[in-house]
Amino acid sequence: MMELQIQSVIYGNKKEALLKAISALKQTVQVYHKKVGELKVSLVYGDASPNRIFLEEDVRRINENLNNEMEFQYRIFGFNSGTAKGHNLMGENCTADFMMIMNPDVILEPQCLTRMLMVLKDPKVGLAEARQTPLEHAKEYDIKTGETEWASTACTVFKTKIFKEIKGFDADTFFMYCDDLDFSWRIRLAGYKIIYVPSAIAYHAKKLAVDGGWKPTGAEVYYSAEAAILLAYKWAQPDRVKYLCEVFSRGGESEKKAVKEFEKRKQEGRLPEVIDKTHKIGRFLGDEYCEMRFKFSK
């Protein structure tokens, strides 16, 4: 029987929202069972919160409510792992055929899982990405094949053997942002395709401003800036590193902090190994990492 491990890193999430996401997952697994066949599914939550979200009684009730559609496992990390390290911790001993990574605030439509797993039947495909709504990711993709340059891991499925082959996420470099970009590019560097599946829909609960744009928090600004500099360094873009450091040094406190952290890593010899020196995979197009189909308002 084919096996799938679904995993989410949680941090201070509301219990009710997580239960809603689990209920939607149960439905999408049921649809797979009815339309395709048997699939053994494990759902793993890695809790990086300072205080645990679920009690033992909650875990027991969740498994009862899942009614053998899938097994729920709850891991307490005991520290703020970030997404990259959290997913590595959950995935390091995974023996399933496939791994699915989801943000905890993602709600799947019933056929989402079925449609992504169908794409992964192709041995040349390494990862399948769902379409997020209400904010669909703007990056370009081939409308005939679905092939795209990288995937957001808000909702993706990939082959476990590839996760092991490329040694998972680069948690030493990326805490939150750009870990999925780096992960995707290394999958392609290993010879596999990234496929965007627009018919596989995942509702991602981002909070929008009144003008329809997305307003990041201070922590999001810091980790995003830090990751942008480190990604450019790792993927052989020294001019981009210089430019970003200059721009962020003139920015707000969160951006200035990101530059200081980069300089500290440099002094301590903690920067990542530079790869893709011929720029075969990684592309830096201004502030984007591939062509975009549209822009969000700011």
What feature does the model see in each segment?
Residues 99:
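Short aromatic/hydrophobic "clamp" motif used to bind/position activated sugar donors
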Residues 76-94:
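Glycine-rich, basic loop-to-helix element that forms the pyrophosphate-binding segment
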Residues 13-35:
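Short, well-formed alpha-helical segments that are part of the catalytic scaffolds
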Residues 139-158, 176, 181-182, 212:
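A recurrent flexible, glycine/aromatic-enriched loop bordering the glycosyltransferase active site
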Residues 44-58, 106:
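A conserved acidic beta->alpha catalytic loop
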Residues 9, 13, 222-223, 238-298:
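Non-catalytic, C-terminal membrane-associated alpha-helical segments of glycosyltransferases
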Residues 106-142:
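Conserved donor NDP-sugar-binding/catalytic core segment of glycosyltransferases
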Residues 156-158, 162-167, 173-201, 208:
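A short, conserved alpha-helix in the catalytic core of glycosyltransferases
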